[in-house]
Amino acid sequence: MQNNEIIKPAKYFSELEKSILLALVEKYKYVLECKKSDARTIALKQRTWQALAHEYNSQPSVSLRDFKQLKKCWENIKARTKKIMAHERREKVKRSVSPLLSTHVLGKEKIASMLPEQLYFLQSPPEEEPEYHPDASAQESFAVSNRELCDDEKEFIHFPVCEGTSQPEPSCSAVRITANKNYRSKTSQEGALKKMHEEEHHQQMSILQLQLIQMNEVHVAKIQQIERECEMAEEEHRIKMEVLNKKKMYWERKLQTFTKEWPVSSFNRPFPNSP
């Protein structure tokens, strides 16, 4: 390779570079994937991408990239992952196998975990209710009479019955299904609330981490400015000392010249006599 040949960065990201990018995006995901679109959040995302690009370029064995290239690569990875997971969702519903299911995507589960709100409907397919077969042999060991089951469940679940109406009493299977649905709904709500609090906490920690990075950069810049001011002051002091030394040497030489031209002994001669 000739010395004057310019080495250009690789056009495509390697698997190693994608892995490093995913690790850094996961580090700042609660800022980069925030759904807010106000000016403060947009500016914060911009600074976060710049900090991420600085960390990325400091890694060994990677090509230098700016934050725009890294952001574009991450958007392409997200779009590809959403497409494949949507296809998997459709295939699960159809109960069929497709060749696309074996498509390899780097860190698909990790990418999905970074997009909880966008891919939630893809990750958690609705639970199917088991069909009720009272005559099935597999359920004989769990079979109980409707009267016994209703007596136990009526202590916890009450259905008001209006007077003057002849509404049939709900069957025990309907009571059990309703109770299970209510329990799952309550559990999912608690899980969603807990997940929301965790995401809010992680987002606050990411913002604090970014603020610390920015404060450190400001302090480093301030120290560098003070060092430059000290160097300038030292240089100015050195120049002033050189000027003063030159003035001192000038007056010393002038004094020596004056002493040679007008020696002190010439002033001690007697005054000449008048004629």
Curated annotation (Swiss-Prot):
InterPro entries registered for this protein in UniProt: Myb_DNA-bind_5
Glycyl lysine isopeptide (Lys-Gly) (interchain with G-Cter in SUMO2) crosslink location in chain: K154
Similarity comment: family membership: Belongs to the MSANTD3 family.
UniProt keyword terms in alphabetical order: Coiled coil, Isopeptide bond, Phosphoprotein, Ubl conjugation
Tissue specificity comment: Expressed in brain.
Species of provenance: Homo sapiens
Domain Myb-like span(s) in chain numbering: 13-78
Phosphoserine modified-residue sites: S96, S98, S274
The encoding gene: MSANTD3
Coiled-coil annotated spans: 211-247
The keyword Cell cycle is annotated on this UniProt entry: no
One Pfam match: Myb_DNA-bind_5
Protein name: Myb/SANT-like DNA-binding domain-containing protein 3
